[in-house]
Amino acid sequence: MRHFALSLLLCCWCGIAFSCDKAESAPKEESAESQWRNQSFTLATWNVAFDNPVPWDDRKAMVASVFETQDFDIIGIQEPWRHALDDLIAMLPDYDYTGTSVTGNPADTDCHNNPIFYKKERFTLLDSGSFWFSETPDIPGSKSWDSYGIRMCNWGKFRDKQTGGEFFLFNTHFDHKGETARQKTAQIVNERVKSIAKGYHAFLTGDFNGDQWSEPYKILTDQFRDTRDEAVRTENADWHSYNAYNYSDKPLYSGAQLDHIMLRPADLDFVVNEWRIVNTDFNKVYPSDHFPIVLSFSFKFERQ
């Protein structure tokens, strides 16, 4: 009888344990909120400047140092010539890049590039392309209106390996002299981003050669939001993003920016944790005539 009672007790205990295991292992129904995956990374824009007036060889170690200390995940850069681009690739082995030169020939040595650098371990490049700021945007090397030089946009579609989220980045460099060209450029950007990125989240980086009160900037705000205005906190927002290699321990201008990071669509659920200008100097020498603008932010991708 004692053995029977003990066996019965053991069976009951096993049954309870088995029921608990089943309850714990049963899949939980996902809430609407849990069907979103948070994504955060650091994105930047930086005109690293070509060789005039300060030679690249005098600055390249400083530029690489800023990359390493700021730990950019993805960045649109402007103006490097081919030899500078080759140096950056060699000095920054964690990064890959996409983008061609303003002529459309990546092998051309004496012309601007505006590539997108991204960490290979963090992102997969899914698609890429280019268009030019002219009346014939699909013709490489074309320019129009009162544009002084050839200007263009390189873009990439990326997948974040950590979350699977996908987004576009459009990296631009507007003309520095032609006001009509800059306004037309803003219109082309609006049209092309809408056509290419469609419903995806799209970032716009670049040297617009116009501040936040300029007409081209206003045209862009028809589609984009300025991440500076959305930031929870800002750092060095009273500094101008252009320094002309003139060292200063205080802001020289009243917070105007030639360089910008914008984001569309306007209804995207996102948080810009921080927007900052990085005014790093090396013994009172700046690595470029522009400061990098850097975002630390989070936004949510809906699971497909």
Regions found by a protein language model. Give the residues of each.
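Short, solvent-exposed loop/turn elements at domain surfaces
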Residues: 50-57, 77, 126, 179, ...
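Active-site beta-strand/loop signature of hydrolases that rely on acidic residues for catalysis
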Residues: 41-48, 63-89, 117, 156, ...
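Positively charged n-region of N-terminal signal peptides that target proteins for export
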Residues: 1-5, 22
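Surface-exposed cleft-lining segments at the edges of enzyme active sites
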Residues: 50-52, 133-145, 172-182
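Metal-dependent phosphoester-hydrolase catalytic domains
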Residues: 27-31, 122, 180, 194-202, ...
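Structured beta-strand-rich core segments of catalytic domains in phosphoester-bond hydrolases
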Residues: 74-166, 274-277
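N-terminal, active-site-proximal structural segment of metallo-dependent hydrolase catalytic domains
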Residues: 18-92, 102-112, 130, 187, ...
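Bacterial N-terminal signal peptides
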Residues: 7-17
